[in-house]
Structures are given as C-alpha cells and as structure tokens.
Amino acid sequence: MVEHRTRGNDREPEEAMTAHAHPPFDVELAPTLDAVPAFFTTLEPDSIADFRAATQRGPASLEDVIAGRPVELTDHTMTGHGGGEIVVTVLRRSDQDGAAAPGIYLIHGGGMVGGSRWSVVPILVEWVFRYGAVAAAVDFRLAPEFPDPVPVEDCYAGLEWFTGRAAEFGFDPRRLLIGGQSAGGGLSAGTTLLARDRGGPMPAAMLLMWPMLDDRNQTVSAQQIDGVGIWDRTSNETGWTALLGDRRGTADVSIYAAPARATDLSGLPPAYIEAGSAEVFRDESVAFASRIWAAGGSAELHIWAGGFHGFQTIVPTAAVSQRAVQTRESWIRRMLAE
C-alpha cells in the first residue's frame, strides 16, 4: 500500500533535521578551524576590540613584503566623507615606463568593524609587480564609531581621489579594476553603484571576493553557518548592526550600504564573484551574480566546494585555494589587458 502524505507533513521533518546542517569543509581546510581564535568564528559586540587588534596588524617589515621587487609605496592623506581624514596607500613599480598602466583600487575586509589597508598591501605588491599596475588601498573609517554611510562614502571619495590623479600616478582610469574581500567586496559593489548613479568614475571591472552584501542575514547559507567556520551568522549580525544600528534588516537600508538590496544591477562593469560553499556569503553571492545576469550584465561566478569564509588567504597551500587563486588571476589578467 502506498502511503499518501501532504506536502507540508512530508517536508517539515526534513526541514527540521537539516535546518542547521552545513556543507562539509574541504579536508585540507578543516584542521585550520581548530586553531583560529573564537572571535573569528563567532564575533560578538564585546569582542570587536580584540577582533580589530588581530586584523589591523601591519607587516613587521615593508622590506619583507616587497621582497626585493621593484615596487614602491607612498601614503597619502585625503579628505573622506564629512571632512574627516583617511589614508590611501599607492603602489607602483619603481621601474615603470612611460606607458599608462592599468589601475587597481582594492578595499580591505574586516566585517565593517576591523581590518586595515595593510591586510591587502601584500597582494597588491604582487599584482603591481605581476601586471605592471598602479594600485591603491584605502583605509575607510570603521563602524560602529563611523556608521553608514561613512565607510562606503569614504571608499567612493578614495576612488574619486585616485582616478583624479591618474596622470600623476601613471595609470589609465579607463582600465581600472575595483575589488575587495568580505566587507571590502560589499563596499566595492556599493562604491560602483554610487559611481553609476552619480555619474562618477566607473571602474572597468569589479572583483568581489567572498563579498558581504546583504544585511538581512536570512539566506539558507546564513542559517547554515552558525557557530562553525569563519564569520558565522552571529558575526554577520554583529558587523551589520555595527554599521546600520536599528536599521539593519528594515526597509531603511540603502543599496550602497547593502548592495543585495539593489533591484537594478544594470550598467555595472564585468564582475568576478567568488565564495565558498560553506560560508555565510555563498547565497548572496549567487543571488548578486544572478541579478547582474538578469540585467543583461556580465558576471563570472565561482562557488568553491568545501570553502569557508576567506579560505583562500587563510590556507593558501590547499589545493582548492590554489585553484581559486589561479582562476581569479586568469580573470584579472584578462580584465587588465583589455
């Protein structure tokens, strides 16, 4: 005899069993999770100071970062949102010829509450050396001391400042790649939306690495990554609440603060979007790419099986990390050559 059940009765036990299940972590990545500080998995508001201290350390030696390559760094103080000062580090080859180079504008991660430009300087040294680019890293001001719209407006001000000095620094602003990791990925998307809507300097390509896009924290992946991995759903709530306060999750959130809120993603440059299958930002990354495609735009999307948040930088020797980096580098090379 065949037992017939309603759809609701059939689905509810399954949903109850799988509500908090998460995709497995890659076998090369998983052991690292046992060694990370607890606040890298679950960040509570009272741990922000410790998290910030751990993510704002600069390199012990710039010479070690440059490692003998012909790359020079200069710091510049500029005016950010509301008249406050921010610092932009510009990197370029010391043996740069007279030809206009491609440009890279990279925004650091840290969940809107931590990190600094120094976290992306090492990768920019490599990209400047490898691609002959002129690059900039911006130190936007952090929440909760500087809530929305300060971070994204600081990033937009930095973009205007950098592109406005393209001739001085020797790069072609029409060949500019904007990008960022985690919060920096979300801020890159928000900054590009501001450029589109204000008629400002439009990047030629957009690199969103495991981007923080959606303040609502309601996707399946946001529910799955709870007390596990790196940057779980509680961390995400902490970061977004620091940025938005009581507005988090309400209708009173702009598309520039939380780009997943944007219903129209037309007019954006070609995008590269990547995330791990076992991280909070997986589903919002997929949705953002899908919305770009729906608007007739170009997006290359990669969801890496078994990857937790930021696995590419935390365990760079893992096979999946190396595949992810090689795939990303191939895209960057194509974008900067065009």
Q: Residue spans of the language-model regions?
A:
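A glycine/proline-hinged amphipathic helix-loop "lid/cap" segment
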Residues: 1-93, 336-338
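Gly/Ser-rich "nucleophile elbow"/oxyanion-hole loop immediately N-terminal to the catalytic nucleophile
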Residues: 163-178, 198
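Catalytic active-site module of serine/aspartate enzymes centered on a nucleophile-bearing elbow/loop
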Residues: 316-338
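Hydrolase active-site cap/lid region
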Residues: 193-251
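Short beta-strand element of the alpha/beta-hydrolase
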Residues: 100-110
